[in-house]
């Protein structure tokens, strides 16, 4: 996929403008992403980011020094993510693919760590997605689910409104994910920041 220098610069400028806009509403993107990574530690092995989006968490994970896989259903969204990585020279750390979270093309037990950040609220079937995560998780691996808190969603709604858009929500919640993991016998550890609700789930103590 060829990118021009102008594309890199323009995309990065849009990224900085969005970070600044979030900051105006009290949402520190970099701080929230760092919170998720720190609460997920320690982790290593085969790492998956489920739901690339525009790549805000992708960038944070790459900047933290990790090599990982990332999939999304949208090639257009992944292009934004790749442009941002290329701006910082981090594109070699991420292997992108297109996939549906309800039918992930991956062997059973392949991933040691699975991140799903700010994705659950876009899902209509959290149970199906979580069961897919469990299927592709290694026996000693862990799944990290993080999504906007009530306060975070309120901020995101305001930001979308400022941009003349509407933040589309499906029915998925982090509590639904927690219920599935408990039913499957997983151990759960929970964390919360002002803007994020987060859980870490694993078959062994997490």
Residue positions per predicted region:
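Class I SAM-dependent methyltransferase SAM/SAH-binding core
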Residues: 48, 54-103
């Amino acid at each position: 996929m060829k990118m021009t220098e102008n594309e890199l610069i323009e995309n990065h400028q849009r990224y900085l403008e969005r970070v600044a806009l979030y900051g105006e509403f009290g949402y520190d993107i970099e701080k929230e992403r760092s919170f998720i990574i720190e609460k997920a530690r320690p982790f290593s092995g085969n790492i998956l980011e489920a739901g690339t989006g525009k790549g805000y968490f992708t960038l944070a994970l790459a900047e933290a020094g990790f090599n990982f896989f990332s999939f999304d259903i949208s090639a257009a969204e992944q292009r934004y993510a790749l442009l941002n990585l290329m701006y910082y020279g981090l594109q070699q750390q991420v292997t992108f693919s297109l996939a549906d979270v309800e039918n992930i093309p991956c062997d059973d037990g392949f991933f040691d760590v699975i991140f799903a950040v700010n994705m659950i609220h876009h899902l209509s079937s959290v149970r199906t997605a979580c069961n897919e995560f469990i299927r592709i998780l290694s026996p000693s691996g862990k799944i990290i689910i993080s999504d906007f808190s009530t306060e975070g969603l309120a901020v995101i709604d305001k930001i979308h409104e400022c941009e003349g858009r509407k933040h589309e929500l499906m029915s998925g919640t982090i509590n639904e994910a927690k219920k599935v993991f408990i039913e499957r016998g997983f151990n759960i550890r929970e964390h919360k920041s002002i803007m994020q609700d987060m859980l870490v789930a694993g078959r062994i103590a997490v």
